[in-house]
Amino acid sequence: MHLNSNPNSYICDAYQHADLLWSLSPHVLTKAVQPQVTLLPTVNGSNPRYDGVDGHWPESPERSPCVAGIIPVIYYSVLLSLGLPVALARLAARTRKPSYHYLLALTASDIVTQVIIVFVGFLLQGAVLARQVPQAVVRTANILEFAANHASVWIAVLFTVDRYNALCRPLRHRATSSPGRTHRAIAAVIGVTLLTGIPFYWWLDVWRDADPPSTMDKLLKWAHCLIVYFIPCNVFLVTNSAIILRLRKRGQRGLRPLVSKSTAILLGVTSLFALLWAPRIIVMLYHLYVAPVHRDWRVHLALDIANMLAMLNTEVNFGLYCFISKTFRATVRQVICDVHMACALKSQPKQTVVELMLKSVGTEL
């Protein structure tokens, strides 16, 4: 487990827990203040020989370079600054439809993913602080990150099953569907995903671990691939195929297919999920059995890009919602107008602000 002293790859060796925290270059951030020495990396593994280690690590010429440079810093900063406000805007919408609660729960899990992984883990600890953190904090963050990812995926699975029942078993769906039942199902999924995140306390960092993967490493990585991709994709494939088949049968009978907005959103969300997460799963298994990330710069770059695509999944859902649903577009428009109004009020004198507020109240009345 070695570290490169090249300043352009320093942040590559910063804290990247759950291997969803990707490489970046701090050349423009820390060159003036950081001496060009080989720093002790944050320990993120279950190997006891790293506990209590202090000092500098020897350089390793085999360390794969960080070829992505400063691009991930800009990418994830834009991703967070754009994705978090619009995700909060989605939560401002109100409805009594059970299917809509699944969308709101999916939004909430996306917010948690963005805050923990992108801001706390990647930008704050890696790009801003550029320092080590206690091992217990790193491992606890692993639990939260994996739990947030698993919750986001499995809430989408719940949403898929709900749409399947609504189209293929409409009478049963109307009799059993209710906001209370939906809330209990979402709460159960969140509780189970928190439990599934606990074993990832011992997740090893693929960016720095030079030792061959142990049995625990293989079990955790395969468990992650099964929980977050293979099992959900099989559910999506079966249910979406049944939904599309039912819609085609309605069209052949001369009836209108009646593709609701929720169903259209569902098909888009699941398709994008399968496409955007596939590269990450492929590269992870390639790293596990063929070439490690820490030695081959091509695998290093491939995992960078794959992780960026996987994180993009939390953002493209919003564009899909707005493209299909008038409710989302109206909500976002209203939130933007409210923010603009608040900024305008702050820039006006006190008397003018009172007049504007009175006019607004008079208009509503």
Curated annotation (Swiss-Prot):
Parts of the chain that traverse the membrane: 67-87, 103-123, 141-161, 186-206, 225-245, 265-285, 305-325
Cytoplasmic side: 88-102, 162-185, 246-264, 326-365
GO CC term, one of those recorded: membrane
Matching Pfam families: 7tm_1
UniProt subcellular location: Cell membrane
Membrane topology qualifier: Multi-pass membrane protein
Any one GO BP annotation for this protein: G protein-coupled receptor signaling pathway
Protein task: Orphan receptor.
Keyword list, A-Z: Cell membrane, G-protein coupled receptor, Glycoprotein, Membrane, Receptor, Transducer, Transmembrane, Transmembrane helix
Lineage: Eukaryota, Metazoa, Chordata, Craniata, Vertebrata
Molecular function (Gene Ontology), one example: G protein-coupled receptor activity
Positions glycosylated per UniProt: 44
Family: Belongs to the G-protein coupled receptor 1 family.
Ranges of the Extracellular topological domain: 1-66, 124-140, 207-224, 286-304
PANTHER family, A to Z: G-PROTEIN COUPLED RECEPTOR 142-RELATED, G_PROTEIN_RECEP_F1_2 DOMAIN-CONTAINING PROTEIN
Xref: InterPro entries: GPCR_Rhodpsn, GPCR_Rhodpsn_7TM, Orphan_GPCR1
Protein name: Probable G-protein coupled receptor 142
Entry annotated with the keyword ATP-binding: no
Gene that produces this protein: Gpr142
Main location: membrane
Source organism (scientific name): Mus musculus (Mouse)
Origin superkingdom: Eukaryota
Keyword Amino-acid biosynthesis: no
